[in-house]
Amino acid sequence: MKKGFNTKCIHGSYLPKSGEPQVMPMVQSTTYRYYDNDEVAALFDLESSGSFYSRLGNPTVDNLEAHIALLEGGTGAICTSSGQAANLICMLNIAKTGDHIISSNSIYSGTFNLFSVTLKKMGIDVEFVDQDLEFEELK
């Protein structure tokens, strides 16, 4: 049975097994116990999935990311602690040392600082331009 949009908003992709909570519970743990070093090694080597430290992910965040991807029709999502963390992840995935980026000069001051200070330290040059310029004027 296909889920409607409202059902997806509430339940996402969470499918409880018999005897499990109807709604995905919030996991309030920072660390996870494993009885076998090989299990942990497989997690670190990305050979298996699971949680080992909440700063890197946990079942609650995994569920949120899957939920957002489902609602957006995407294949995955990344949730971050802040918009600035999201901005940095985006920039580091499209630019590398020696690259030149053009940005509007009419952006959030924190993003301006990220672009003009942090990215500069990483060897990524950002040029700020008037957002009302025509494409031909940028050349």
Q: Residue locations for each model-derived region?
A:
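PLP-dependent aminotransferase-class I/II
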Residues: N113-K139
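Well-ordered alpha/beta subsegment
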Residues: G73-G74, H100, E136
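N-terminal glycine-rich, Lys/His-bearing helix-loop that initiates the first secondary-structure elements
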Residues: M1-S48
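Conserved N-terminal alpha-helix of the aminotransferase class I/II PLP-enzyme fold
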Residues: D36-A85, N113-V117
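Hydrophobic alpha-helical segments in the ANL/AMP-binding
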Residues: I89-L92, G110-T118
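Alpha-helix C-terminal capping segments
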Residues: L70-L71, I89-T97
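Conserved PLP-anchoring active-site segment centered on the Schiff-base-forming lysine
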Residues: N93-T111, D130
